[in-house]
Structures are given as structure tokens and as C-alpha cells.
Amino acid sequence: VYAQLEDWNALERLLPALTKQKVMTVEALSSLADAVLLGQLRNAATNVSELQQLWKKAKASQCETPALVTEYSKLLLHAGEAEGARRALEKALKKRWDSETVLCYGKLDSGLALKQLLAAEHWQRFRPNDAALLLTLARLSLRSELWGKAREYYEARLAMQADAEAFVEYAGLMRGLGFEAEADAATRSALEAAGLNSSLPMPRSV
């Protein structure tokens, strides 16, 4: 009932009793505790102090859970605490490497893109063939306006793992650099990767 009403504080108070009575499996209790924290974080969305307090009292395992740490960082960013969002993601990745968390780090516009890029390049020394990290490096290079480096990272990522999103971003970069043919080819590859390429005949320009 509390979950349906989204009364997360009431549910939090119930957790010790549910644990003691063993009416739920350990996995179900863990999922419920994560849902409670997620709901509380979203309710505190615009209050940086409350967000930080909730995170401070969270279990260590929750602070490493990808869905929770990425949501927490997004909420902090939207509340104007970009530095806290960056630190939360870096701390989580230090404890537990996860592709979704890495991708979230690459999308984070903290205003300190070069600092993030240096951190990500340090990680790459130990994970040279991580596809998610290569895409993050490409995006952070773009934010840092390091076009040549961004191109290298996109091409390395696409050689390893081709997907529509990366092709679209790469096409935008190449078009911006004036490489129209490469941009057009990347756009076609993006459509193919998304399953949108058509085998229907098309008119040719005269």
C-alpha cells in the first residue's frame, strides 16, 4: 500500500520489521530498499542538502548500485551541484566498474570536461578495450573541444562496437570538421545499425 501511495518514508520505517519477520527474500528486501531510496531521492530532487543527507545515510552497496548512483548524480546536476554529481560517479566507479555508470559520466555536463577527460584517460590505461569507456572518452573530448582526439576515440569505439547513437555523434563531428563524405557514410551506417535502411529503389539525381 505504501509503495502504491509512494510513501517512501513510511516504507523505510517498515523495512526493519520486514527484515526481522523474514516475510520476504533477501533479494526482494534489497530491491524494496533500493526502491525506497530512489523514491526519496526523487522527492528531494531540488534540495541539494536533502539529497546529500539521503545519500550519506544510504548503505555502501546502494552507493555503488548503477541505477541509484546515476539517478543521484542526475538529480544533483539538475539541482545545480555539478561537482557533487561528478564526484559521486567517480567514487562509484572506483568501487564498482559498470558500463551504464561510465556512460552517465560521459554525458555529465559538469563544466569540467577536461578534468573528467583526464580521469577517464587514467581509467583507460587499465581498461583499453572497454567500449563504454571509449564512447565516454569521445564525448568528453567533444566537450573539451579536442576534435582530433574525439575523432580517434569515436573511430576506436565504432571499430569495436558499432551502434546508431555513436554513428550519429561521429557523423556530426565529421560534418563539423568539413568531411562531408565521411559524415554521409556514418549517417548511412547509423540507419543500418538502427535497422532503418531501406532496400526500396530510389531515384538518382540527373
Task: Report the location of each language-model feature.
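TPR alpha-solenoid repeat register
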Residues: 1, 28, 68, 101-102, ...
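Solenoidal tandem-repeat scaffolds enriched in leucines and small polar residues
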Residues: 1-57
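TPR/TPR-like (Sel1-like) alpha-helical repeat modules
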Residues: 1-24, 86-99, 158-164, 172-199
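Residue at a conserved register position within TPR or TPR-like alpha-solenoid repeats
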Residues: 2, 76, 104-109, 141, ...
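Structural motif corresponding to the intra-repeat A-B loop/turn of tetratricopeptide repeats
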Residues: 5, 45, 78-79, 108, ...
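Single-residue signature of alpha-solenoid repeat helices
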Residues: 11, 50-51, 85, 116, ...
